[in-house]
Amino acid sequence: MSTIKDVAKLSGISRSTVSRVINNHPYVNEEKRIRVKAAMKELGYVPNSSAQRLRGSKTKTIAVLISRIVNPFFSGLVDAMDSVATEAGFQLILCNTRGSKEREMTYLNLLRTKQVDGVIFASIENNWDDIKPYLAYGPIVLCNEYTDQTDIPSFRINHFQASYEATLHFIKQGKKRIGLCRGDETLGSNLGTDREKGFIKALQDHHLTFNEQWLFRNATNFNDGRHVFQKVERMSERPDAIFTGSDEVATGIISESRGSSIHVPNDLSVIGFDDQQIADVITPGLTTIRQPIQKMGEQTMQHMIHILTNQLSLVGHTELLKTELIVRGT
C-alpha cells in the first residue's frame, strides 16, 4: 500500500506539503496541490484514516447516487431501498449529484476511501470509463439507468420496449405527428438513447416520418414541460402528440396548455413516464408508463446486500422488470 513518502517522491513535493494537501490546508500553492493530487491518483493512495478503515471492519453502509432528490421517482426508489437496507442491518447514504459529473465522482470517492462498502447508481453522469476503475474498491450496482459498456449487475426496465408501446398507443389513436422529449444526451447512460430508438422504431413500423423539430432535448422537469409547450405554440407545423418520458414534463405541458387555444388532449395528446401520484390527480388524468419503482429499488438493494454479506465477486446480470401502460385522459 502506498504511503505519504511515495506520494512525496512521485510528486517531487515535501512530505509536509503533501500532508497539508491531504488535510485540505488552505495555504498550499495550487500547482503543488495539483501535482500531489495527480500522484495520489496514480498511486491509488488512500489517506491514513481511510486506510485504517480498509484494514478494519466493514461500514455496513451503501451509497445511492441520484440526480434530483426532488423527483418523486427517486424518492420512491430510495425509500424502497432504505426499507430493505434497514431490515438487513445496513444503512443508506443518499448522494444527490444534481446532474454534476464532479459531484458524482466526489461521492464515488467514498468507495475508494472505504467510507461505504458499495455504491448503487440510480443515475449516471460520467462515462463508464471514468467510473470503472472504482470497481477495484468495492461493488457497484446499477438501478434504473445503465450503459452497454458495463459487465455488472443492473436492475431496470426495457426502455426501448416501453417507448415503443407508448408510441404505438398514439398511433392506434390516429396520431400521425408525434413528438418526443428526452433528457441530457451527454450522460453516460443508454436510457434516453434506447427510448428514442423505441420511439423511432414504432414510427417506422407504421410508415410514419419523424420531424426533428418535434424532438425536445434536455427536458426533465415541470418547467421544461412548460417550455416545450411554449415551443409547440410557436410552431407552424405542430405535433398532435408528445411522448414526454417523464410525468413531470407531461404535467408541465398540461399546466401550460390551460388558457391556450391548443387543448390537451383534443389538439395535443400527452403520455408521461413513471406513473407518479400526480398522474392520477391532474386534470385530465395523465396517460403514462408505470414503472415498478418499489420492486426495482427492493431487488437492487437486496442484490447489493447479498454481494456484500457473502463477499461475492460481481457478475454481469441484467434484471428486466415489466412496465404497464396506464391509460387515462390525455
Regions found by a protein language model. Give the residues of each.
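Hinge/beta->alpha junction and helix N-cap segments in small-molecule ligand-binding domains
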Residues: 67-75, 95-102, 155-165, 181-228, ...
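Short acidic capping loops at alpha-helix termini that bridge into adjacent secondary structure
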Residues: 177, 210-214, 263-269
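Short beta-strand segments enriched in small/hydrophobic residues
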Residues: 17-20, 54-70, 177-186
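Flexible loop/hinge segments that line or gate small-molecule binding clefts
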Residues: 121-165, 209, 248, 274-286
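Amphipathic helical "hinge" segments at domain boundaries
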Residues: 34, 46-110, 114-117, 196-200, ...
